[in-house]
Each structure stands twice: as C-alpha cells, then as structure tokens.
Amino acid sequence: MSSYGGGYQRDSYRSRGGQGGYSNGNSYGNGGGGGGGYGGGGYGGGGFGGGGYGRGGGAAGGDRMSNLGAGLKKQEWDLETLPKFEKSFYKEHPDVTARSQREVDEFRQEHKMTVQGKNVPRPVETFDEAGFPQYVLSEVKSQGFERPTAIQSQGWPMALSGRDVVGIAETGSGKTLTYCLPAIVHINAQPLLAPGDGPIVLVLAPTRELAVQIQTEITKFGKSSRIRNTCVYGGVPKGPQIRDLSRGVEVCIATPGRLIDMLEAGRTNLRRVTYLVLDEADRMLDMGFEPQIRKIISQIRPDRQTCMWSATWPKEVRQLASDFLNDYIQVNIGSMDLSANHRITQIVEVVSDFEKRDKMIKHLEKIMEDRSNKILIFTGTKRIADEITRFLRQDGWPALSIHGDKQQQERDWVLNEFKAGKSPIMVATDVASRGIDVRDITHVLNYDYPNNSEDYIHRIGRTGRAGAKGTAITFFTTDNSKQARDLVTILTEAKQQIDPRLAEMVRYGGGGGHGHGGYGRWGGRGGGRGRGGGSTASNAAPLGNNRRW
C-alpha cells in the first residue's frame, strides 16, 4: 500500500490549473444520456418528432474517414528536454513474493493464462495484493467484487509496473478495470493540469457505445480523487465536448475520427499524454481506423506508457504493437486461436431465408416465458434491423433497434430501455456487437450470420458475461456456406453440438457465395421503407394488440 506514497491523491479541487471544480457537473457523462425525455410520448405515439431524425446521415456521424489528420502538425520530440514523469508504481506484495514458481505456474494454468516478454510480474490473487492506494481500493470493494478476474490478476501488476502491455482476452473479461485503475494511480502521480493542457490519459475506442461504457467506469472509480474526464465521439454536437476539453480533463476517452477533428481544430492537444490505451485494437483496425490511430499516436510523446487490449491477435494487431510499443509484456487469457466463451451454449440452425422469421418467433415464445430474460438480435444490415423491429412490434413484442443511422439520443434511449428490462428485445447491427455493456443479456440470436468468425465470436460474447451462462442461437444459410468450416471449428473447440447439415456443408466444400443474408423474407430492397419514414420509425411502430410479453 505505502508503495504509492501518500501524495498522489489530488487535493480538493485545487483549481487544476485555474479551471475550478467539476464545471457544473458536466465533466462526467456528456457522452451519455443526452437529456431529452422519450418516455412521455415521443416513441409509440407520434413517432420520434415530425422531422429531423431519420435523415440518414451516415453511420459514423462525426467520424468521417476520408482525409482525417491531414492538418495535424508533425511533432518533433526531444526526450532530453521533455518534462520527466512517473509511470512505475508497482511494488510486489509479500504474499506474492512468498509463492513458489510452481504455485504461480499452477495459478496461470488454472486460469488459462500465458505470458510473454522479459521479467513479467507475477499475478496477484486478491485486490489487496495489487497494492492499490486506499482511495482506489475502497472504490473497488464498495462495488462488491470478490476477487480479480484472470486478466486483472495478471494485468494490474503489468500496467502498474510502467511497462508497455498487450492484453488478449475475451469480451466480458473485466479488461476495462484492468487499465482504468492503473490509469487513476498514474494520473495522481503527475503534476496538476495547467491552463491549455490536454489530458494525461487517452483511451481510444472503436465505438461510441464502448467509449461511454469506459467513461462510466472511469467516473465511478476516479470519483474519490476528483479526476475529470470527457467522452469524445461523433454523432452528437461538439459543443459540450469542446467545453470539457477547454476546462481541462485528466482523461479523454475518444473514437479516433472525432478526436482528430478536435486536434485539427485546436480544441485540445496530446502533449501531456503519458498513458495511452488502445481498447479493442482489433476492432478499430477492422473498422479502418489504422491511419487515424497512427496519426494520433504521432502526436504523443514516444516515452509514454502504452496499453493495448484486444480480443484477438491477428497479424495487423501484432504489427501495430510492434510499431508503437517498446519492449512490451503480454498476457493472453484462453487459447490464442479464435475461440468462443465456453459458458455460452451455441445453437446453430441451418435454415433458408424464408424460414428465419417463423423460427425467430418460435425462439422468442420460448425465451420470453421467463420475463427476466433479455435477447439481443443481430442482423446484417440496418434496413433489416428496422424491418424486423417493426414486424416484432406489430406482432406485440416489445422490441427496439439500434444501429449507426440512428441519432445518438435515440441510441442512448434504446440502450437504457433494454438495460432496464422495459424493452427486453433489442435488434442491432454490428455497430453494437462490441461496446454494449449490458451484463444480464441471457440470449443472442444471429438472424443473419456475420461477415467473419471474429464478428461471430464478438456477437455471441454479449451473453455469458462476468461469469454468467448464456445461449447463442444462429441462423446459417447456404449463402454463408463459405464460413461453415470456421464455424464448425469454433463449435468443436467449445464442445457444442453440430447440425448435421452444417457438417455436410463442410464435407462438400460449400459454394453458396456471398448472398444478402436475410433480404428474401422481406421482399427485396425496396420493401418496407415507405411505411416508416426513416430509420427511427421502426422504434415508433405501435405495439400490436396481440401483446406477446
């Protein structure tokens, strides 16, 4: 405990560079709830307002990809003249030191943990062994956690040591806290922000939803040391984000596109960043953010500490780590091969497009017998997400949809309704396949099979989180047959039953090609658009008289 000394806790609101306090409470959560009120009538009655919403826009909101970062000035770093900073805080607990190497090896083996790199610290088995200062420890214990997850056991000593870190772990493994708590310790060891300073900690995330989830954790655990944060992402007005940045925040959680917008406009800078986190690095690369990530990192001093977190370890992620991390240490939880969470029961049904709707209803009838269940339904396109939602609502099911064309306030409202169980059926595209942190999702249904096995793993990983069990149901058509072999490999590794027709596709080599997933059922590309008047209309469709739940 004393290894951090007593001086890291920020005193009171000590002006943080003259900015003063929490600035009307806005520093937390400008990314979240948007303020509007949808309960009193917007949805279900007259729709989501007569105009404005449903204009289309584009999935990424402010995160346009074209020529982002062209206006950023190239930074020349002279390490001799840069201010020094602290990043090594870890002191091994006597109980950890006392364990034999055999005990350490057995612990790692039991938790399917492998480590790589020089002088990797030993894992800790309790929160006290991590050696966090009391102000961090009390926040953790107040949340009722019993013991660290596997990634936390090994990741905390690694991150607190000041080394560059790579962590590979399944979704729902507790990785957010693995970098958040060391970030809080790191901030409290640095000089206070001066006017004009940018953040000390930068967290890059692929989606708005994940960014808001991270902000919630940072806010919760940074409260006692009065650490301010903001969430910077596209699809919402820039004004509140600009205000937060100008007042000064120690932590900035951002999607790459909107952050570059802010940097190019001179709204913030990254000169003070000494702790950089790349969360879901594989997903950011999948989404085409690599050029933006490279431009952002070029604005950060090279002797920073960098932590990279990913669910998979493909060659593109390995290359990024090689380019931007120095002498890094790595922890992998689980197999390095693509694998699914073994607490999830996977049911794959080979169907035709025309069977999907009826089969979905049969599953819903069974699942919703238990009113505490929550189901997340994934579709291949935004159009199908809206059409299914409209169909389900008209059939009496309390369904809402979320995807990239919906404005941020609507997305926040839908997520809150789903979390609260008021609308226990949520239909989503892959914009929601990561970053949605709803811990009690009991079922996932893949109405359309995703484009690749990685997305399949991440979709079904929305259930079975935090030690719970879950069920994933997947509709697989002949159009998906080129992916049959990969899917069978995943099912076999997780010891799941395999539909004989799926095995047959593998045996005969498939050959369906890339079809349109679920379009057939809905009568072609034009069908259904006119009824609703924009993407929002699906959530405004009145519930049918035949209430199914």
From Swiss-Prot:
It is found in: Cytoplasm; Nucleus. The keyword GTP-binding does not apply. Residues 156-331 form the Helicase ATP-binding domain. Residues 1-41, 523-549 are annotated as: Disordered. One of its GO terms (molecular function) is ATP hydrolysis activity. ATP binds at A169, E170, T171, G172, S173, G174, K175, T176. GO terms for cellular component: cytoplasm; nucleus. It is an enzyme of class 3 (hydrolase). Associates with polysomes. Residues 17-41, 523-535 have a biased composition (Gly residues). GO terms for biological process: nuclear-transcribed mRNA catabolic process, nonsense-mediated decay; rRNA processing. InterPro entries: DEAD/DEAH_box_helicase_dom, Helicase_ATP-bd, Helicase_C-like, P-loop_NTPase, RNA-helicase_DEAD-box_CS, RNA_helicase_DEAD_Q_motif. The Q motif is unique to and characteristic of the DEAD box family of RNA helicases and controls ATP binding and hydrolysis. Belongs to the DEAD box helicase family. DDX5/DBP2 subfamily. A motif (Q motif) lies at residues 125-153. PROSITE patterns: DEAD_ATP_HELICASE, HELICASE_ATP_BIND_1, HELICASE_CTER, Q_MOTIF. Its EC number is 3.6.4.13. Gene3D superfamilies: P-loop containing nucleotide triphosphate hydrolases (3.40.50.300). ATP-dependent RNA helicase involved nonsense-mediated mRNA decay and ribosome biogenesis through rRNA processing. A motif (DEAD box) lies at residues 279-282. This is ATP-dependent RNA helicase dbp2. It catalyses: ATP + H2O = ADP + phosphate + H(+). It comes from the Eukaryota. Residues 359-506 form the Helicase C-terminal domain. Keywords: ATP-binding, Cytoplasm, Helicase, Hydrolase, Nonsense-mediated mRNA decay, Nucleotide-binding, Nucleus, Ribosome biogenesis, RNA-binding, rRNA processing.
